[in-house]
Amino acid sequence: MEDERLVPVSPRHAVLLSREYLTFVDTPPQRDYVVRTVAKRQVGAMMLMSGDLVIASADTRKSFPLAERYPLHFRKSYFPGQMHGETKDEFDNHARASTLIDIPPPIGHTPNTFRSCLLPGRPYSRLSPFFGVDPPTANIAEAEKLPLASAAGLWKLCEEAFSKLVTLQEGGLAHGDAELHNFIVCPTPLELILIDFEGSVSREAQTAEAWKKRCALDLEPLLREAVYLQCALGKQRGRFAELALERMPLLLKQPEQFHRAIELRGSVSG
């Protein structure tokens, strides 16, 4: 047996696995083999939710055809005591999103589990120099320190994220939790992928007013990031940039400080 091998984890992604894990890929274990726990929610010693990278068992592969194709994948498990939405709804909304914005499809679900493709990348929030900075006005100084190449790259990623969110909404689906950690930046191929559709809602299930509000809320994290990045780059063109400046008074306190920083950066750049 080879020491290492590329194993597909989605229609366009693969990861290099060592022999230790290839054994379970080639010979399905009796139970899902947990490679790593990447997220968990608990109260004291009581586990409520666990998000794990797993190698699918024989039964899992029989139950879900995509688990046979992508045995290494992400499994979210809910335990008694954890309130959660219907996993079938999450599966259906994820599948709908995959057709609207070309993301890897979901793998499967049971009443207490949800499975999706492993995405080899990092959350956008970990790439942003502005994430977690408080107060928000401190991001003006962070923006001034940001190299042009970094600011330009982050801007292009955010434009891509904005385009995908808008396409999703125009297709009748609102994400419901479009925080920056739910945008995964994958390097090979370089792309940004939206994850976690547990809180997604369809337009037909909302009143017109509720739908409008939900869509606006989904855009807020990206629009704030757009303001911060324009403090580094100066005023940009296009719907994304314009909407961020238009809604700035609703997004940030002391919007005049950000306006001034953007104008000054533009004059320096020019």
Task: Identify the meaning behind each predicted range.
Residues 1-40, 45-48, 249-270:
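Regulatory N- and C-terminal appendages and interdomain linkers associated
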